[in-house]
């Protein structure tokens, strides 16, 4: 009789575990090393190849872009990690990480292009008008519309 009860209880446990959905837990933070390497590779590509960013700020040589990308990613990872708390589910930290990378990348290319622009400005005069928001008088447009009377 004890064997029958044991077999029935074991069957019940087996059925319960089969009926329960498999719960898989994953953590979004911290990112795996593979993910971090992918971020670095994408940064290198963004910094060293022609893009919208490079049209405005120029490109970096491959070796400089590689070093800069690693530094940007490490600093962003450290900054995001310092904001982490047990209450966060990871998505907020990942957003901080992403924003830090973007901010640092822009700051890097801006600071790199500023000295180049300054030395370039010393060698030749600026081709832009003093206030680019105002229409150019050279084009003959003043921005004003005058009325014209016509005869019927």
From Swiss-Prot:
Localisation: Nucleus envelope; Cytoplasm; Golgi apparatus; Nucleus
UniProt feature, compositional bias: Polar residues: 134-152
Tissues in which the protein is found: Expressed in young tomato leaves, young fruits, and flowers (at protein level).
Keywords for this protein: Cytoplasm, Golgi apparatus, Nucleus
GO biological process terms on file: lateral root development; mitotic cell cycle
Pfam annotation, one family: WPP
GO cellular component term, pick one: nuclear matrix
Sequence segments annotated as region (WPP): 12-115
Keyword Membrane tagged: no
Matching Gene3D superfamilies: WPP domain
Region span, Disordered: 1-33, 107-152
Subunit and partners: Interacts with WAP through its WPP domain. Binds to MFP1 and FPP proteins.
Record text about domains: The WPP domain is required for the nuclear envelope localization.
Designated name of the protein: MFP1 attachment factor 1
Taxonomic lineage of the native organism: Eukaryota, Viridiplantae, Streptophyta, Embryophyta, Tracheophyta
Name of the gene: MAF1
């Amino acid at each position: 009789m004890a064997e029958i009860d044991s077999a029935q209880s074991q069957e019940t446990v087996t059925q319960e575990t089969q009926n329960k959905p498999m719960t898989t837990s994953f953590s979004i933070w911290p990112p795996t090393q593979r993910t971090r390497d992918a971020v670095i590779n994408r940064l290198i590509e963004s910094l060293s190849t022609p893009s919208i960013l490079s049209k405005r700020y120029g490109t970096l040589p491959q070796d400089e872009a590689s070093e800069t990308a690693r530094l940007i990613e490490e600093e962003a990872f450290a900054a995001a990690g310092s904001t982490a708390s047990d209450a966060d589910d990871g998505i907020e930290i990942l957003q901080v990480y992403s924003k830090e990378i973007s901010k640092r990348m822009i700051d890097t290319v801006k600071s790199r292009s500023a000295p180049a622009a300054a030395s370039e400005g010393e060698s030749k005069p600026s081709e832009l008008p003093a206030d680019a928001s105002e229409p150019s008088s050279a084009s003959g447009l003043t921005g004003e519309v005058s009325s014209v009377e016509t005869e019927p």
